[in-house]
Structure formats: structure tokens, C-alpha cells
Amino acid sequence: MALGSVAWPRVKAALNHIPVETGIDKIARHRPLPEAEASRLIETAKKSIALFDHPDYWQDLSELFHYQAQKQGFYSDAGQALLKQSADSARQSLHLSPANSKLWYKLAAIDVLLHEQPDTIQKKLLMSIRTGPHETAVLTPRLRLCLSVLPAFAQADRDVLSSQLVDAWNLSHKRFIKAFDSALYMDTISALLTNSHPLVLKEMVAEFETTH
């Protein structure tokens, strides 16, 4: 009986949260949510959290706030306020479950939209790398963001970025070239790889030249 009473809040929260998961799936499939539905799902997610404090519920709440911010316009006053709520919810999720590479990256991306300082963004990016160095879903966009705030990285951390660049290159030459197809990116990549991975850099340059 005692075991059942302990488990019941978790079960009740999971059942309550089903509509939120359905809504998040719609967002992931780029299917629009009416504003009223998104607002209702936010309240449902908050109720799930009140029933059982779970990192996934906080992450879903963050996603819903982010979705609403996008609909309002990220740089509008309303959008900025919603982004702050999205960031707060993401931090709560990471407090409960820190080993979430995708969410650390998402939080760094939100920081960019909130005009946070590069060193603040860099810390989240490093956490994303440390908790998921081979997380292919965020490997390339994370690297693009890292390169945009490169001066905030210490030398030891730049060595980590060099390894990440090699991993992304080895994963798919075609996707790498598409993602980093600009002289500015290649200048930065060259600076990172010249001493640490000269042969890989030579291979990159050769393939980039054949595409132009």
C-alpha cells in the first residue's frame, strides 16, 4: 500500500503529461500549435511538475516557452520574456539531470538570442561537449556556435574544439562542407587545425577547393 502511494504521483504526472508530449511531437514535426493550445500545454506541463518533479517535464516546458517566443518574435519584448522562461526551465531540467548534451546546447543557443556575454555562452557549449562529445544531432550546429564565440575559449578548450572538428569531418565530408562553406569559417578552422591536425586540414582544404 505504501509503495503504491509513493508511485501514484509519478503515474498521475505521466498520465497528465501525455498531451504535452503530443504537442512537443507536433512542434518537432513542424506542425503549428494554436496559441491557445500552446498556452494550455504550458499549464499542463506545470501541473506535471507539481505532481512529480522530473527533468523531462522541465525540458518540455522549456520547449513550449521557446516555441511561443518564436511565434512572438525572439527579439520582441514578449519573445525575450518567454526566452527567459525557457532558459529558466532548461536550467531546472539540467539541475536534475546534468548529462543532457542537447539541452546544454539549446541553452547556449537561447543565451545567444538573449544577448548574453560570449563567456556565458561558452560555458554551456563546453558542458554540451563534455556531456555528449559524440552527440551527432548537435555536433555540427554546436561547432558553428563555438566558432562564433571562439575568443571566449581558453587554449586547452580550443584543443577540444579541434578534436570536435575532426569528428564532424569524419562523420560526413559533404555535411561538413555544407555547414562551414565560407571563408570566415575556413580561416578559423585553419587556425585551430594547423598545428594539431595538419593532414586533416590539408584534406579539408582540397575538398573545399573542388566545390568552388
What feature does the model see in each segment?
Residues V149-H212:
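Terminal, low-structured helical/coil segments at or just beyond the last alpha-helical repeat
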Residues R31-E37:
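Conserved alpha/beta-domain cores
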Residues M1-V6, A38-S48, A78-Q92, D119-I129, ...:
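Alpha-helical repeat scaffolds
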Residues S76-L147, F153:
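Non-cytosolic head/periplasmic domains of membrane-anchored proteins
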Residues M1-N16, T211:
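Extreme N-terminal leader/anchor segments
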Residues A7, S48-I49, G73, H115:
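A general structural-boundary detector
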Residues V11-R29, A50-G73, S97-I110, T136-S148, ...:
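Amphipathic alpha-helical repeat scaffolds of TPR domains
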Residues T22, K26, E43, L64, ...:
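Charged/polar, solvent-exposed surface patches and flexible loops
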